[in-house]
Amino acid sequence: MSPVINRFAFILSEKERKENRKISYSDIFQETGIATSTLSKWATNKVRKYDADTIEKLCKFLECQPGDLIVFVEK
């Protein structure tokens, strides 16, 4: 397992809770242009390369900082 993981699913669930609504990958795609297949990889921590443009769009959508989204876990 890579020591770099993302917290996309957790932060998305927090946003859903705060806004009291379910947010689909289609909703995110409509607002960000990020493919639903890419969002699925983020949600399941199967991202192999972290693209700066994708990170920027996710951070804007989720209203978070890159350091909130991607973390390094020491083994």
Predicted regions and their residues:
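A short, Lys/Arg-rich alpha-helix, primarily the initiator
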Residues: M1-D27
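Short, charged recognition helix plus adjacent turn
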Residues: K41, I70-K75
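Helix-turn-helix/winged-helix DNA-binding modules
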Residues: N20, V47-Y50, F61
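Short alpha-helical elements of helix-turn-helix
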Residues: N6, D51-D53
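DNA major-groove recognition helix of helix-turn-helix/homeodomain DNA-binding modules
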Residues: D53-D68
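Short, charged early-sequence alpha-helical segments and their helix-coil boundaries
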Residues: L39-S40, T44-K49
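Short alpha-helical DNA-recognition segment
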Residues: N20-K41
